[in-house]
Amino acid sequence: METGQRTSRKVRKLGSNRRRQTREPADGEGAAVAPEPESWSSQAAAELQAFFQDCGAKERGFVTREDLAVAKFSFLGSKEESEMIFDWVDVERKGHLSLEEFSSGLKNIFGSSQSPHRLRRRKPLPSKRVSATTSFPALEEADAEEKEAFLAFMEQLGTGHLLPKQMEIWQLWGQLRQEEPQLAGNLAGFLAKMTSRLQEAQADKEALELTLRKRDSDHHREVQQLYEEMEQQIRQEKQQLQAESDSRGLALTSQMQDVLEAKEREVQRLAEGQRELEAQLSHLRSTHQEAASENQQLQEAKRDLAGRLEEVRGQLQVTRGRLDAARGRVSWQVEEKLSFPGAGEKTPDPQAASPEEAPLPGLFGDNDDWDQLLSNFGSPPHGALQLCWSPPPTPRATSGPQTPRVVRQISISEPQAFLFGQEPSSDPDGAPRTPPGVTFSAKDNKGVDPHEQDIRAEQPVEPHDPDPNQEPGSTPEGRLLWGLSGSLVAPAFKVLIPLEDGPPPPANSPPPQAPAGSSKQIQASDPDDKGPGSWAPPSGAQPGAGAGPQEPTQTPPTMTERETQPGPSPTTALTGVGPAKPPRQRDALQQDLHATGSEPRLGTQRARALTLGPAEPFQGLEFVGPVPTERLEQGQAGPAVQEGLPEGLREAHGQVLGLGELSAFPHQELEEEPRSEEGKQEGRGGQDLSSEQSEQSVEAHGLETAHSELPQQDSLLVSLPSATPQAQVEAEGPTPGKSAPPRGSPPRGAQPGAGAGPQEPTQTPPTMAEQEAQPRPSLTTAHAEEQGPPHSREPRAESRLEDPGMDSREAGLTPSPGDPMAGGGPQANPDYLFHVIFLGDSNVGKTSFLHLLHQNSFATGLTATVGVDFRVKTLLVDNKCFVLQLWDTAGQERYHSMTRQLLRKADGVVLMYDITSQESFAHVRYWLDCLQDAGSDGVVILLLGNKMDCEEERQVSVEAGQQLAQELGVYFGECSAALGHNILEPVVNLARSLRMQEEGLKDSLVKVAPKRPPKRFGCCS
């Protein structure tokens, strides 16, 4: 601290001396000006210009510290001095100096021996001083004492090696000692201070350089470390990526290997399958070749047998001709032998001779019994009904039952094989066959069962007329047979009818080769099964035909057995549905039906005419109700054609239905018969006659009132018998593979104890109002209903014996989707009846949906709906019976006007679209516009998307359908008619919605009714 204060005082003294020296020239006038200091040497200027040129400062225009590091000036002592000189010159610490600044700075420092602060001219000293200054000797020439003092001073300062020119300091020191000795001490202090500062700056520089070198080394080390770490991280990443790539490659390789192995196994399996298929194909080819060869052999055998058959027929014709000739020749011989028989003559037994041993008529001897012979060779009368058999005749069996399929193999599908009135070839045996146990003769009643005399009046279907000259069709029995079975044409067999000669026998007669069997084997298991016990006179056995006695093969059934046996099916007996007949046949049918109603013996004969079988009388045909003969002429059908079985026939299974009832359905003329004739119906089992007459009148009235409702039904009736193969198979009776009948239907066949008599009726027929209340289906429904399952025509539950007045639906039995109660005909008294119309574009699946809903089966070959179709669906929802009249409309544009007409009375509408067709979904709004144009505001609407099974081809999402349904405020759902998914649920929900809407409407009506306008009082009140 003291040293610093002393130094500052010395500086102030030095400054004061300077100020005094500067003022001296101004004070002294006329003083001479001091000479100019020593100028900047030309050598230094040349070195400076060379320095500027070498370091490039001349081009740049400035000088930096780095440029001075390589500079070599003669006036500088060392490299450190050059760096320090830059610090002296760079006062502003900019780091760079221009050429002028650097040159002026150097000149100020090294240009003169004077201090850079003494720039002005001083007043010239007195002559003594000038002379002394000029005469101041150099350091070498100075005194030793002064020289030692100066050297000691320099050693004290320690700056001898730092200053560039010691001579200048010597001169300055000497000058100060001579001129101003008081400033010598200040010079020493100044030099000491500057030296210390230079030393401190040098030390700081060295420290900074050391720190810089250390920082540089640390920086290089850190950079190297970071570089090494980065390299190591890069190597690790590369190794990791390589490992992942290798593992992925191994996994893909193993996966591809597994796939290749699986493909190879599949190829091997396919190759094995191909080899197996080739083996099967070769086996099938060989089998086909064998079958073809066998077929060819069978064809040859068939042709051979046909030739033999023609040959036998020719021989038979020749035999008949010879027999006729023999009759004419030997008639007198027969009379003579009958009048005078020989005592020793023995009549040969014709039964003992075999067919091979029977001689021709021309080869007979004189002792032969021609009467017996002629009776054996009797031919059927002209005009008798003939049957054309498709299978070859089989030999008679002595015992054992016969399957019903043989009966249904009668082929009458080719009625044009013989002309009307032409007699086809009869049985190869040449003799007509009578029914088992019954023989006819012109002389006596040989072979007739004792019970035949008792039941002959009750069996009009058996023509036992003793008069041989009477025509078969002239008797009441014949006409009744014609009226009953003239239209009994089932799909399994048909009858070729000669028009002029007489009516045919019943179509339910057994074939001529029906085997003999005991009466215990007679069972009424199926009304269509023509077993050994169900018999009728065949075509060849006519009364009075002149046939000789034949060996009886079976006794006729007794009274109990006949009551047990099912008669002709009520379906075929009542409807008369058959193939298209010529007009003359229909006229004959019309005349015989009218003639039947006028016979006096009808009341007695119809007592046991028909035994009603199970509710499925003939599964090959659709039961369409009674068809009046007047409608047959006009080509129309009654309204009950589509209504199912009439109420008069919906009785318990096994109950006997009289001919009075039966005749009341086809025509109204029988309604005028006296009740005394109807009172003779002993086979009704105690049924009330008043209910029968009311039933007849109701049915006849219904047929009469609906005479003009359904035109053009003739084509419908003609098309019904064209049964499908399935219907023909079903018509052949029950097979072991068939399932039992559904619940609610009585069992097939006769009930235990049915032989004692018919069962009692359980319920009276419906009234006229009930029949009129039932909805009548449209014209297009008959063919669609014909294709339905056989169990869809079950009898009503009212006819069950266990609960006469309770329906299965009313009892709480919820029908399943396949239950016939759920899809049967409409109920007589349903709880709710609604009209539901299906709308949508063509080919969206409306018909398939309704077919699946009604038939429980998906049909693949349905054609487009023409106009409109109609179905009735009965549902039990929440213990309520719903009858839904489902209208299937056509989606084609040409039928839209008809669809709009139907929308006026619709209670519910199902808008159906195809989820695989965006166009059908877009057309939903068009159908809604049609619905609004029709004025149906309060209609319950269901938006239904079909074909959920085609999910891959879906174009309309579920969200789009839900959004549209929310926008329109309707119900929404999706279904699949092909898979049967969500079929019944939307219909059930629709029925509930319709019921809620109707109940709400009723409640609103109840609420509105009490609100009456207040009574107006008079003006005086």
Swiss-Prot record:
InterPro entries recorded: EF-hand-dom_pair, EF_hand_dom, P-loop_NTPase, Rab, Small_GTP-bd, Small_GTPase
Composition bias, Low complexity: 532-559, 736-759
List of residues binding GTP: 840-847, 888-892, 946-949
Any coiled-coil regions, as ranges: 191-315
Alphabetical keyword list: Cell membrane, Coiled coil, GTP-binding, Lipoprotein, Membrane, Nucleotide-binding, Prenylation
Keyword Electron transport: no
Disordered, as annotated region: 1-40, 113-133, 339-405, 419-483, 495-827
Lipid-carrying residues in chain (S-geranylgeranyl cysteine): 1019-1020
GO biological process terms on file: histamine secretion by mast cell; histamine secretion mediated by IgE immunoglobulin; vesicle-mediated transport
Biased composition (Pro residues): 501-514
Annotated Pfam families: Ras
EF-hand domain residues: 77-112
Keyword Lipoprotein: yes
PROSITE patterns hit by this protein: EF_HAND_2 (PS50222), RAB (PS51419)
Main subcellular location of this protein, as a coarse class: membrane
Compartments reported by the entry: Cell membrane
Extent of Basic and acidic residues compositional bias: 443-467, 676-685, 783-810
Biased composition (Polar residues): 688-697, 710-727
GO MF annotations in UniProt: calcium ion binding; GTP binding; GTPase activity
GO cellular component assignments: azurophil granule membrane; plasma membrane; specific granule membrane
Family the entry assigns: Belongs to the small GTPase superfamily. Rab family.
Protein name according to UniProt: Ras-related protein Rab-44
Naturally occurring in which organism (per UniProt): Homo sapiens (Human)
Gene coding for it: RAB44
